[in-house]
Amino acid sequence: MDISFLIVTKHRAADLKVTLDKLYKIIDLSVHEVLVLIDGCNATEAIVKDYNWVNWTILKQSVSASPARAILYKKAKGDIFVGLDDDAHPLTTNFNNAVKHYFETNPNLGIIAFQEVRGLFNTDQDALQHVKTGEDYITTDFIGCGFAIKKSVYEATNGFPKWMTIYGEEPALAIEVLDLGYDILYTYNLQVNHRVNTKLRKQQGRNYYRFKHQLRNSIRYYLVYHPKPVKKLIRLLWHNFKSYALTDFKYFKMYWQVVFSALLSLPSILKFRQPVKRSTLLKQTNLKSISYS
């Protein structure tokens, strides 16, 4: 099996159908597979019968994004894993061969970070009008809506962490890949259309759910991976207190909920502690950050 396309989904059946219909047009089921995990959503289960070529995993109780990915990725058989959000699909012509070519010509390549083209477009041709151009570069992270990782590299790591929820699992996998000595490449030449309503997101403003989970997972990230996490944690907590907790009562309340929860869960999180090499942290500092659309 050449490529496994992997999608975790919840509460977005209509978006998932669009993604699966797009994928079906570009895959060859003799060498490609599509695996979808439904993370505790009865409404999405209703479309399973319409896609018998998909390898479905159905969880009756939600476990959140990162643990769900950890479950799903263990089932993939392809030499290359392509991770997609349920509302994202490839735009690049000859996408599959292009992904394979990148890995075949660079043995040290662990992850390819695709260019994210955000927005709702009438056609893929319209979406391609918004593609940016530039030189590929080695980076520190990848965007979860569209990326590729070699199966052998993924299996050499601990995979997506079960001790995280959502928002933050990509940096955890990325730092483990870097610590193994592999590269993460951002390329403008492989694009995915992330079909989000950018205007609506801007109008929605504050995102309390994201704030809570990002802060929680960032604390855990430093506790697990950094050799000396105290300074990083102080900076993280001060930044979030100053920039969020002091500006809004709901942020303030969530901030302290996360802090006290982190203290209570400290013994269980430290069981996963796996500090990376100092050379990995230095590499992170010197590399160019990923480009977010």
Across the structure, where does each feature detected by a protein language model lie?
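Acidic donor-binding segment of Leloir-type glycosyltransferases
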Residues: L20-L59
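Short aromatic/hydrophobic "clamp" motif used to bind/position activated sugar donors
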Residues: F81
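A short, conserved alpha-helix in the catalytic core of glycosyltransferases
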Residues: I149, V153-N158, W163-Q191, T198
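Catalytic core of nucleotide-sugar-dependent glycosyltransferases
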Residues: V192, K202-K232, K253-S268
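Non-catalytic, C-terminal membrane-associated alpha-helical segments of glycosyltransferases
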Residues: K228-S293
